[in-house]
Regions:
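Histidine- and aromatic-rich ligand-binding microenvironments
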Residues: 7-8, 39, 94-95, 116
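Active-site neighborhoods of divalent-metal-dependent phosphate/nucleic-acid chemistry enzymes
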Residues: 3, 68-113
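Alpha-helix capping/helix-boundary segments
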Residues: 11-12, 42, 76, 100-101, ...
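Short, well-structured N-terminal submotif of metal-dependent ribonuclease cores
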Residues: 1-38, 48-61
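Nucleotide phosphate-binding site architecture
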Residues: 12-13, 47, 121, 129
Length: 131
């Protein structure tokens, strides 16, 4: 499925916590015409946090269903491996989940919506968009 942006976990958490009035909600309204995808690892991280916090599972499902899941494929494996190698050689590795998220955005040739610039700005070719 084609997506216009890939969302990071911190975006989903912000939107969940802030309700309709915060920056993530404002960004969503301003970009209502875009197809916003979440990488499989973002979905897993969000579900894990919701489970630990004891949030209602149906409410979480309803919240997530508006965002199509960006799944792993062969191209992403190669992008991940290349990114890992490049960042390791530069001694600038980022967390493994963040590396998968970056690979998802790069494989789809779309920006990543995140506030985690410290990690993601190290990834060559990754376009970042804040909210």
């Amino acid at each position: 499925m084609r997506v216009d942006r890939v969302l990071d976990t911190n975006f989903l958490i912000a939107r969940w916590r802030e309700g309709e009035g915060g920056p993530a909600s404002v960004w969503l309204k301003a970009n209502a015409n875009l197809i916003l995808g979440i990488p499989w690892i973002v979905k897993a991280e969000f579900l894990r946090g919701a489970e630990i916090a004891g949030h209602d599972r149906q409410a979480i499902r309803d919240f997530l269903k508006r965002f199509p899941t960006v799944w792993l494929d062969e191209d992403k494996l190669e992008i991940y491996a290349s990114l890992y190698s490049t960042l390791k050689k530069r001694n600038e590795l980022i967390g493994p989940n963040d590396l998968w998220i970056a690979a998802s955005a790069l494989q789809n040739s779309v920006p990543l919506v995140s506030k985690n610039k410290i990690e993601f700005q190290r990834v060559p070719g990754l376009r970042l968009e804040s909210y």
